[in-house]
Amino acid sequence: VDCIITDPPYFLGMTHNGQKGSFKDLSICKPFYRDLFQEFNRVKKPGACVYFFTDWRGYAFYYPLFDLYLGASNMLVWNKQSGPGNHYAFIHELILFHCGKGVSIGATNIIDNIRSFASGAKLVEGEKVHPTQKPVALIRKLIEDSTKPGDLILDTFGGSGTTAVASIESGRNFVLMEQDEIYYFTAQKRIKDAYERFNGGG
């Protein structure tokens, strides 16, 4: 694949071998993410970029594994412009970034590591699409910064299909994975609608 953009679940409330998951014990997920990053390294092209979303709670866990198996090139900051929190609202998320050697991002423009886009969670036909949905404009910007039309984008935690929609809008191909049935069908509808808008239903 030419680029990987993904936003993993936070695993709040999950159980693993009888243990309850939280940000304090993400170590129970370490084998999963070790295997995931190794697979990223296997399926991506040598010059491909990887964008991996997290927040301040997950960063300390994810970064060492990401750097070990992929090699961290930078950390991007997404300014959401608003957010929850009682002890100073956190209005940003972090994006671990890997890019192959010799690859320039936005070679014709000066690009900093701050991205400001309003939060992507919204109502569609009266229902919330996804609680951590990213704005299409943000994902499209990452895609267009690091790929060219016709390239293949992978998202292993597809959610409601934002990466797929952004790929369609920017003329890229995509592979999307999502195990939650509700989000799967939501993504399916959004993808169909995006094709009808941008490709005449192709």
Where are these regions (language model features)?
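Core catalytic lobe of class I
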Residues: 1-185
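S-adenosyl-L-methionine
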Residues: 188-202
